[in-house]
């Protein structure tokens, strides 16, 4: 009998190893982790009802686990191999994001666990972007970038062998899993030596700094890791006290009684020394630490309302003005769980209370009545995915405050999936299935 390690266990080992590596490479990220943990502890101490709810919904244990990282790759082969690598860790491609609409020349997906059980064990996810070389205006430069990318291999031979072994055997044993984590980590390690000369780097950087970040280095170095906080506004306000320079605006929706979707901020990317191929030295700015506060996942109806209000709000000159404007506009978005539920704006996970187990639902009883009677408890489903406008805002602000908008490309999910070698899953279908399955477990709704 084979004794294979579970994908969840391998994912946990990998996320812990990546966190340790990133704290060594970017010490300020370790400081950020300390700040977030202190803020979370304070929130839980001051809000016992929130703590009790997180415990009841099995959310508390996963709170202090890292929530996501982000990488960028240059070729279809790199993306397809990453899909196979992440499959070893139980992470599947979910969602398609076209960041070119916001002036960033990439399109993306999120590799993440999809089952409720896997998300509870470790919700680690990696936002993965593929460079769109066709958005480089200069044909000569585009061809040069493609040639540079064709010469590199971002995976070690041992990593490729272990992926193949996993595919043949259907799993990895303990020692092989450790070796896999060690080898996979090399793909995401920072290298201060560029694969190009300074002139090429500058030419690509002038097209877009992100293009230089993808093309000019030997691997797809992790460009940020992101812990989860319960109060992102407090973290943002405390960052300067910890010697951390925050980005100007918190991305996403405003502060609310019932948080929705995803709010994100970060510290500004570090300027790091680089040695180029002709021996020249310079600097590169790309890597940073991010913080996120996750709320309830929205239905298509809720998401349409969110997108409309966000567009109406625009962008404020500073964070205080921006948040005030958002708060004003988002008064039109219901801010209590009952309204979100009854207007079908958000997804919920339903479970029987002790009272409900003693007196199970009977045919014909409405969900609203069962909730009012305390026989069914409705927990908001945590949003597990990303927001393209927020992701683009984070990327732009950490590639320098100078805007580098390019001509937007047409969204091409088909091209992305062809490069990936597989379809991406629809996040809305996953949330809908989770809500429906929870209703079935309660004895209402059809399987």
What does each model-identified segment do?
Residues 1-447:
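Extended, well-ordered protein cores
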């Amino acid at each position: 009998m084979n004794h294979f390690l579970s994908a969840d266990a391998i994912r946990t080992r990998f996320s812990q190893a990546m966190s340790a590596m990133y704290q060594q490479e970017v010490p300020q990220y370790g400081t950020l982790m300390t700040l977030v943990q202190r803020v979370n502890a304070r929130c839980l101490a001051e809000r016992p009802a929130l703590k009790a709810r997180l415990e009841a919904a099995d959310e508390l244990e996963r709170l202090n686990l890292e929530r996501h990282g982000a990488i960028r790759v240059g070729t279809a082969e790199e993306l397809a191999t990453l899909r196979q690598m992440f499959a070893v860790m139980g992470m599947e491609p979910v969602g398609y994001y076209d960041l070119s609409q916001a002036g960033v020349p990439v399109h993306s997906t999120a590799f993440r666990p999809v089952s409720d059980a896997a998300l509870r064990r470790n919700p680690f996810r990696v936002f993965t972007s593929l460079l769109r070389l066709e958005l480089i205006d200069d044909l000569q430069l585009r061809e040069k970038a493609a040639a540079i990318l064709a010469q590199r291999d971002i995976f070690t031979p041992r990593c490729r062998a272990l992926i193949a072994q996993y595919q043949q055997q259907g799993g990895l044993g303990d020692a092989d899993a450790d070796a896999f984590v060690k080898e996979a980590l090399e793909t995401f390690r920072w290298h201060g030596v560029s694969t190009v000369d300074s002139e090429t780097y500058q030419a690509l950087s002038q097209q877009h700094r992100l293009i230089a970040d993808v093309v000019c280095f030997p691997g797809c170095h992790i460009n940020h890791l992101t812990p989860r906080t319960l109060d992102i506004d407090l973290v943002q306000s405390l960052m300067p006290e910890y010697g951390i320079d925050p980005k100007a605006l918190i991305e996403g929706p405003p502060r609310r009684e019932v948080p929705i979707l995803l709010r994100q901020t970060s510290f500004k990317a570090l300027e790091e020394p680089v040695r180029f191929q002709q021996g020249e030295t310079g600097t590169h700015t790309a890597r940073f630490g991010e913080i996120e506060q996750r709320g309830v996942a929205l239905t298509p109806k809720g998401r349409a309302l969110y997108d409309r209000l966000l567009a109406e709000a625009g962008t404020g000159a500073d964070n205080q003005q921006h948040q005030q404007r958002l708060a004003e506009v988002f008064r039109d978005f219901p801010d209590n769980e009952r309204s979100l539920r009854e207007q079908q704006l958000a997804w919920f996970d339903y479970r029987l209370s002790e009272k409900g187990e003693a007196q199970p639902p009977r045919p014909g009883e409405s969900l609203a009545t069962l909730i009012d009677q305390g026989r069914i408890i409705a927990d908001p489903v945590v949003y597990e995915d990303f927001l393209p406008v927020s992701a683009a805002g984070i990327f732009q602000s950490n590639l320098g405050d100078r805007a580098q908008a390019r001509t937007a490309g047409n969204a091409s999910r088909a091209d992305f999936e062809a490069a990936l070698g597989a379809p991406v899953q629809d996040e809305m279908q996953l949330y809908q299935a989770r809500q429906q399955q929870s209703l079935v477990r309660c004895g209402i709704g059809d399987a």
